[in-house]
C-alpha cells in the first residue's frame, strides 16, 4: 500500500519544476547580490554628497578628499537623451522593416533580410564604435551638422558649433542604428503573429493595402511600444561605441552638437583613475546604481507591454 502511495505521489511531482527551481533561485540571488554590491559601494558617496550627487553637474577630482566634488547630472541626462534620440530613429526604421519583410519582400529576399538583421543585432559594440568614430562622425559633421549650423543656428538645438562632430547627435544616431535590429525583431515577430483572419477581413471589406497595413500597425501597438522601450533600455547601457563618438565632456545641455557623457562612458573612462581618489570609485558605483535602477524599471515596463500583447493575441 505504501509503495502504491509513493508511486502516486511521484506521478504528481513535476520533475522539470524541481530541476528549474534551483536555477531560478540562483538567478534571484545573483540579482540581489549585484544590487547590494552596487548599493553598499555607492553608500559612501551618497552619504557625503546626498541628493546633490544626482542633480548637480560637477566633476572635481582632488588629492585631498575634502576638495573632491562630484555631480552626475550630465551623465544621467546624456544617457536618457541619447537613448531617446536612438528610439526616435529606431521607431520608423523598425516598423518599415517589419512591414516590408512580412508583406512586400519576395521569398528569396525575406530570409536574407532576417539573417542580416539578426547578425547586426549580435555584432560586438566595438565594431559599431570604430565605424561610428571614423566614418559616421565625419560624415555627419561635414554634411549635416555644418549645414544645420550655418542655416538653422537660430534654432537652439543647432546653435552649438560642430567643431569635432563627437556629440550627443552622433551618439544618438549610432545607438539608433545599433538598437534598430533589436526593436525590429520584436515588431517583426508581432506583425507575423497577427491572425490571418484580420487581414482577410480587411481585404474583404475593400480596404487598400495601405489601409490594411495602417489597421494592423494599430493592432500591434503594444508590441511596438514594448520593442521600443526594451530598445531604450538597451541603448542606456551601451558603453564602448558611445564612448568613441559622444565626446566625453560634462555638458548638461540639449544642444545636439555639444559633446557629452553617458553613465556608461563615464564609468569606462574614469574607472581606471578612480583608485587614486577617495570618493571617485564610490561615485562611479553610484552612477552604476542609477543605471541599474533605470534599466530595471525600463525593462519591467517593456516586458509588461510585451506580455499584454501576447495575452491579447492568445485571446
Curated annotation (Swiss-Prot):
One term under GO cellular component: plasma membrane
Instruction: Give the Gene3D superfamilies listed for this entry.
Output: MetI-like
Residue intervals of the ABC transmembrane type-1 domain: 76-302
* Protein name, UniProt field: Probable phosphate transport system permease protein PstC
Q: Which Pfam families match?
A: BPD_transp_1
The record's section on PANTHER family has: PHOSPHATE TRANSPORT SYSTEM PERMEASE PROTEIN PST (PTHR30425), PHOSPHATE TRANSPORT SYSTEM PERMEASE PROTEIN PSTC (PTHR30425:SF1)
Compartments annotated for it: namely: Cell membrane
Give the bilayer topology: Multi-pass membrane protein
Q: What does this protein do?
A: Part of the binding-protein-dependent transport system for phosphate; probably responsible for the translocation of the substrate across the membrane.
Matching entries from InterPro entries are given as: MetI-like, MetI-like_sf, Phosphate_PstC, Phosphate_Transport_Permease
Q: Which UniProt keywords apply?
A: Cell membrane, Membrane, Phosphate transport, Transmembrane, Transmembrane helix, Transport
Extract one GO BP annotation from the record. Answer: phosphate ion transmembrane transport
State the organism of origin. Methanocaldococcus jannaschii (strain ATCC 43067 / DSM 2661 / JAL-1 / JCM 10045 / NBRC 100440)
Q: Name one GO molecular function term.
A: phosphate transmembrane transporter activity
Span-the-membrane segments of this chain are: 18-38, 80-100, 119-139, 167-187, 227-247, 283-303
Q: What does the sequence similarity comment in the record state about its family?
A: Belongs to the binding-protein-dependent transport system permease family. CysTW subfamily.
Amino acid at each position: 500500500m505504501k509503495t502504491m502511495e509513493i508511486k502516486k505521489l511521484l506521478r504528481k511531482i513535476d520533475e522539470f519544476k524541481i530541476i528549474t527551481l534551483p536555477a531560478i533561485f540562483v538567478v534571484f540571488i545573483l540579482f540581489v547580490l549585484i544590487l547590494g554590491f552596487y548599493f553598499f559601494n555607492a553608500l559612501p558617496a551618497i552619504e557625503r554628497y546626498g541628493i546633490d550627487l544626482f542633480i548637480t553637474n560637477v566633476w572635481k577630482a582632488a588629492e585631498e578628499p575634502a576638495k573632491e566634488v562630484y555631480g552626475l547630472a550630465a551623465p544621467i541626462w546624456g544617457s536618457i537623451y541619447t537613448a531617446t534620440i536612438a528610439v526616435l530613429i529606431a521607431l520608423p526604421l523598425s516598423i518599415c522593416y517589419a512591414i516590408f519583410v512580412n508583406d512586400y519582400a519576395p521569398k528569396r529576399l525575406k530570409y536574407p533580410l532576417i539573417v542580416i538583421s539578426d547578425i547586426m543585432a549580435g555584432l560586438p559594440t566595438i565594431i559599431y564604435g570604430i565605424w561610428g568614430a571614423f566614418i559616421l562622425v565625419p560624415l555627419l559633421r561635414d554634411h549635416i551638422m555644418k549645414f544645420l549650423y550655418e542655416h538653422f543656428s537660430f534654432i537652439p538645438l543647432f546653435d552649438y558649433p560642430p567643431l569635432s562632430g563627437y556629440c550627443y547627435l552622433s551618439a544618438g544616431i549610432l545607438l539608433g542604428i545599433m538598437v534598430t535590429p533589436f526593436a525590429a525583431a520584436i515588431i517583426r515577430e508581432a506583425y507575423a503573429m497577427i491572425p490571418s483572419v484580420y487581414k482577410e477581413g480587411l481585404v474583404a471589406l475593400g480596404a487598400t493595402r495601405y489601409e490594411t497595413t495602417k489597421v494592423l500597425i494599430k493592432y500591434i501597438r503594444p508590441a511596438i511600444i514594448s520593442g521600443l522601450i526594451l530598445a531604450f533600455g538597451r541603448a542606456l547601457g551601451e558603453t564602448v561605441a558611445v564612448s568613441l563618438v559622444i565626446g566625453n565632456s560634462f555638458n548638461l545641455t540639449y544642444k545636439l552638437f555639444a559633446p557629452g557623457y553617458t553613465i556608461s562612458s563615464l564609468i569606462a573612462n574614469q574607472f581606471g583613475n578612480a583608485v587614486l581618489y577617495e570618493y571617485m570609485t564610490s561615485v562611479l558605483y553610484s552612477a552604476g546604481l542609477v543605471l541599474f535602477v533605470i534599466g530595471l524599471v525600463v525593462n519591467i515596463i517593456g516586458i509588461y507591454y510585451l506580455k499584454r500583447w501576447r495575452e491579447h493575441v492568445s485571446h
